[in-house]
Amino acid sequence: MRVLLLGLFFMMKPLLYLSLLSPCFSWAFCFDEAGRFYNVDPQLLKSIATVESSLKPNAYNENKNRVGEVVSRDFGLMQINSHWFDRLSEFNVNETNIYHPCFNVHLGAWVLSSNFSSHGYNWNSVGAYNAGFSKRTENARKIYIQKVQSVYFKMNVQ
């Protein structure tokens, strides 16, 4: 994990400059670059970002428990969940840089790639991006899979 994230850190500097010049270009480049780096289909990453945030880089969501307490938060294009922050703190992931589109896409690709590594390159691993692998969240995972597949197949038909 350390090597992958260090690679991400060094790749991000030129991408930061590119995004200042042309945000639309850099977003497309970021999905492609993250896909190559983590061996994940860039169209799948873009489909997830579409479902998660409607491609809004400043998207923010609070996840609440049954009594209305905030238990976690989701940030940016890929809606990176705050539970990852402790694991990524040594790489300076915080509530400011998480909104940078390229950085956010790379983090999302890392999460998805981790799912593929642990549970196989399949739709269940895609569903776990949002709902985890728990038996308790199986229905939510299936619903999420359908949403992502719908976007993904529409993108690939065009």
Model-derived features with residue positions:
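N-terminal signal peptide c-region/cleavage motif recognized by signal peptidases
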Residues: P23-F25
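Sec-dependent signal peptide recognition
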Residues: R2-L6, F10-L20
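Detector for methionine-enriched segments
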Residues: M1, M11-M12, M78, M155
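Catalytic glycan-binding domains that act on GlcNAc-containing polysaccharides
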Residues: W27-Q158
